[in-house]
Amino acid sequence: MSSERDLVNFLGDFSMDVAKAVIAGGVATAIGSLASFACVSFGFPVILVGGAILLTGIVCTVVLNEIDAQCHLSEKLKYAIRDGLKRQQELDKWKRENMTPFMYVLNTPPVI
């Protein structure tokens, strides 16, 4: 049970952190493009682009962590993963008990 809980925590935290990083990266890229255009157009120093990207990434990360904390998104994701694993185990048990061995083999995904 402990290893399953650790797996669920790892998958939930990792998935949520990747989603936050993708969102923050996309927003920072968009802001960086706009800052680059402004620097080229108005003659500002190009170092401002890096600062804008860094500041945007930090702000996005803080905002996304706050949204996660307020809406409990990580906990909901972990609950959904835990529920999905439980349902998968129930389905596998039903298949073992109710299907012929031939059909069970046909309906079992290959292990890679």
From Swiss-Prot:
<keyword id="KW-0997">Cell inner membrane</keyword>
<keyword id="KW-0812">Transmembrane</keyword>
<keyword id="KW-1133">Transmembrane helix</keyword>
<dbReference type="GO" id="GO:0005886">
    <property type="term" value="C:plasma membrane"/>
</dbReference>
<protein>
    <recommendedName>
        <fullName>Putative inner membrane protein YafU</fullName>
    </recommendedName>
</protein>
<feature type="transmembrane region" description="Helical">
    <location>
        <begin position="44"/>
        <end position="64"/>
    </location>
</feature>
<feature type="topological domain" description="Cytoplasmic">
    <location>
        <begin position="1"/>
        <end position="21"/>
    </location>
</feature>
<keyword id="KW-0472">Membrane</keyword>
<feature type="topological domain" description="Cytoplasmic">
    <location>
        <begin position="65"/>
        <end position="112"/>
    </location>
</feature>
<feature type="transmembrane region" description="Helical">
    <location>
        <begin position="22"/>
        <end position="42"/>
    </location>
</feature>
<keyword id="KW-1003">Cell membrane</keyword>
<feature type="topological domain" description="Periplasmic">
    <location>
        <position position="43"/>
    </location>
</feature>
